[in-house]
Structure formats: structure tokens, C-alpha cells
């Protein structure tokens, strides 16, 4: 009889209202979609989600048996241990996978966890948030295995927790080429028209968290504007739901003249069009566990500027353009390189294809199968 893997896939149902799954939820959804396409998996897989958002959810038509624990998280996990208790005693499985950093488990459950990074744990330590600290420590010490998405993230996990190096495995995420690819020009223009965006422009898609470093990017863009005498130079488009008021006030002039544009959450189709139409994607982040925007931009045929830190060179390799996260002059030089037509797009197109081919969701799924088999 085959053994059974149970995956708690929280986050995959969030797109029903917004049309968007981001970050951890997106990686879980893409992993499961890739597993769904593999016929020779030597064990059974079951999937479930908790909370009311899963009620009526179709689980993307996956072949895996699926279920919903329809109790609000606050009651099922935070105020009681009802969900972990129910899972342990009534959901028949040999191994539980928690793919979203941390969760509640019942004593004696055999589980593996995917830790994407340690940002949330560091915040909890800084704030003295003991419930979150305990959850992370439970994940690190009580799991039978840990998966992460970059060598950098592995090194950070090992720094935070006293665990054996061999307990932590690394498998890179894939390029979502079913979502991000080169649009034809007409389709791109139709989407940009509906968004009110006109070319040429630089694009930044990951803005909300302070570590995304958008304040420095805006300072660099303002300097770029001062140095550039062309009226129709590249604008800066930022996908950002709720930019802070002080930033809106500080850059009111650029917002008023249309050179800086803030867009709220956009659909995947709109995001693809934004990538495809951009001159360059600007991703000046201070720290990442993986860095999806690099692969998304490459898949859409658009170069990316990012920073020489954390995992970013593992993903962007020798194809991304690297700057210091506080080096405004370097950022301006990259902007001017594109503005003056000095960037070699033909070389980029050849080299970026190599990156896209390497980061495959099928490869990711098969590596995860090996990981699961190790602990089943």
C-alpha cells in the first residue's frame, strides 16, 4: 500500500477575491500544479486548507483528494488546538508538509516544513512575540526535514537554529512560464491602455515592505530625472496598494506630472503586460529568500536591476544588473544606460533563456518528490 503525504496548502485560495496569489501562496500553488502533472509519483498526495476562504474552493481541478477544515483560524488554531487535533486523529496520512514557514502542529505529528526565509522569525525576536517565536522553533526542531529555496536561506536558517546542516535541503523555485511570457505587442498595449500606462517606463512590482527599498529607488529616479533632459524619458511605475502618505507628499510633483505612477494590485495578466512593456524592472531589495520578480521579468523578455545581496545572485546569476542597495549613483547609471540605448538586448535575450530553462517547476516538483520520499 502506498504511503500518503498530506499538504496543508494555505494561501492558494486567496486569488478568488483579488485575482492574485503572491509570495508563499504562489509557490505552493505552482508546486502543487507541477506535482499534479507528474504521473509516476510513488506515494499518494492529499491536500487541504483551513479557514473560511476555502469553502467552495475548487483546488484548481487537481487530481489529488482535497478537503477544507472550515473553522476560522483563530478558533481552530489560536484559541484552541482543534484543527491540529482533528488532523492528527482523523486525516489519515504518513507525513504532513507545511509549505508556508510555520504553523500549529499536534504533539507526535510527523512533518516537514518549507522555510522560505527567516524574516518573520527575526521580526518576532525583535518584538518579543513569543507565540510566533515558539511556532518557528517548533518547525525547526520538531520537523523531520526542512526545505528552503536558496543556499542563502539555508545559511540563515542554520544561523538561527541549532540543527544539523543535513536537515536542511535546498531546491530552487521555478519560472511560471504559464503566467509570465512574452505577450504580442497588441495584447500588451491593450492591457497597458486599461491601466492608463504609457511607454517608456521602468517597473517596480514588489514595493510594500520597507526592505524592498523603494524610497532609495525613488531618490535615484528623481536624480535620473534631473540628469535627463528628454521630455519623454522613462517613467517609474510602482505596483503598490497603499503607499505611505509622506511618500505621496514628497513625490507629489512627479506624481502630478505623471513621471511616477502608483498602481494598486493588478491581475496576473496585467502584471505580465507591465513586465512585457517595461524598459527594465527595478528590484532594489535589501533582502530576499528567493526573488520571483527576477524570473518573472526574464520570462517576459525584460532586463532587471537588482542588488548584490542575499540570494539574488543565485537567481539572477550573470544576467541581472547589480547595484548596491544604497548606491543611488549606480542605480542612476543603470537607468541612463537604458535611456541612452546602451544596453545589449540581444545578448540579454540569449542569456535570460538559459536562466529560464534552468529554473523549471517540473524540476522543482521532482526534487520535492525525492525530499518527501526521504521522510515518508
Where do the model's predicted regions map?
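Carbohydrate transferase catalytic cores enriched for Leloir-type hexosyltransferases
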Residues: 1-376
Amino acid at each position: 500500500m502506498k504511503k500518503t503525504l498530506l499538504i496543508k496548502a494555505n494561501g492558494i485560495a486567496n486569488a478568488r477575491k483579488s485575482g492574485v496569489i503572491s509570495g508563499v501562496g504562489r509557490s505552493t500553488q505552482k508546486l502543487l500544479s507541477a506535482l499534479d502533472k507528474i504521473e509516476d509519483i510513488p506515494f499518494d498526495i492529499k491536500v487541504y486548507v483551513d479557514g473560511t476562504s476555502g469553502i467552495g474552493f475548487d483546488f484548481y481541478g487537481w487530481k489529488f483528494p482535497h478537503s477544507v477544515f472550515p473553522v476560522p483560524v483563530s478558533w481552530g488554531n489560536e484559541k484552541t488546538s482543534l484543527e491540529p487535533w482533528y488532523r492528527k486523529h482523523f486525516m489519515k496520512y504518513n507525513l504532513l508538509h507545511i509549505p508556508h514557514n510555520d504553523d500549529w502542529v499536534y504533539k507526535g505529528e510527523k512533518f516537514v516544513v518549507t522555510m522560505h526565509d527567516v524574516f518573520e522569525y527575526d521580526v518576532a525576536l525583535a518584538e518579543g512575540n513569543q507565540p510566533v517565536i515558539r511556532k518557528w522553533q517548533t518547525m525547526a526542531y520538531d520537523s523531520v526535514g526542512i526545505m528552503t529555496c536558496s543556499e542563502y536561506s539555508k545559511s540563515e536558517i542554520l544561523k538561527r537554529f541549532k540543527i544539523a546542516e543535513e536537515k536542511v535541503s535546498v531546491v530552487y523555485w521555478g519560472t511560471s512560464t504559464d503566467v509570465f511570457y512574452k505577450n504580442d505587442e497588441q495584447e500588451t498595449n491593450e492591457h497597458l491602455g486599461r491601466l492608463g500606462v504609457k511607454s517608456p517606463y521602468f517597473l517596480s512590482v514588489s514595493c510594500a515592505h520597507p526592505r524592498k527599498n523603494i524610497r532609495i529607488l525613488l531618490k535615484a529616479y528623481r536624480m535620473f530625472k534631473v540628469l535627463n533632459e528628454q521630455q519623454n524619458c522613462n517613467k517609474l511605475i510602482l505596483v503598490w496598494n497603499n503607499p505611505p502618505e509622506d511618500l505621496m507628499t514628497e513625490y507629489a510633483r512627479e506624481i502630478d506630472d505623471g513621471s511616477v505612477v502608483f498602481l494598486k494590485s493588478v491581475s496576473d495578466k496585467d502584471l505580465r503586460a507591465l513586465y512585457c512593456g517595461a524598459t527594465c524592472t527595478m528590484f532594489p531589495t535589501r533582502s530576499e529568500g528567493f526573488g520571483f520578480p527576477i524570473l518573472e521579468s526574464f520570462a517576459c523578455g525584460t532586463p532587471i536591476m537588482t542588488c548584490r545581496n542575499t540570494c539574488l545572485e543565485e537567481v539572477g546569476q550573470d544576467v541581472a544588473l547589480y547595484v548596491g542597495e544604497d548606491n543611488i549613483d549606480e542605480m542612476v547609471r543603470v537607468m541612463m544606460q537604458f535611456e541612452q540605448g546602451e544596453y545589449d538586448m540581444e545578448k540579454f535575450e540569449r542569456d535570460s533563456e538559459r536562466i529560464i530553462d534552468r529554473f523549471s517547476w517540473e524540476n522543482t516538483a521532482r526534487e520535492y518528490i525525492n525530499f518527501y520520499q526521504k521522510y515518508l
